[in-house]
């Protein structure tokens, strides 16, 4: 299921950040390897969630133009 969110934090040096799901309000971990393009804090994005051993993780992260 595709979700809508906003990037609340992204650290380009470390290659990860967090996305706030606009519907549930939940904060989801996002790694640069799962982004179609590099995001910045404040970007609106679409994404999907997969469960990893560390909890939910955003995949297929795409900026909404």
Report the location of each language-model feature.
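A residue-level detector for short acidic-glycine micro-motifs
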Residues: 9, 21, 34, 60-63
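OB-fold/S1-family single-stranded nucleic acid-binding modules
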Residues: 50-65
């Amino acid at each position: 299921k595709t979700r809508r969110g906003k990037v609340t934090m992204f650290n380009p040096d470390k290659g990860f950040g967090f996305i706030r799901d606009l519907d549930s309000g939940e904060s989801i971990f996002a790694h640069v390897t799962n982004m179609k393009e590099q995001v910045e804090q404040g970007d609106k994005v679409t994404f999907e969630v997969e469960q990893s051993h560390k909890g939910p993780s955003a995949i297929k992260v795409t900026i909404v133009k």
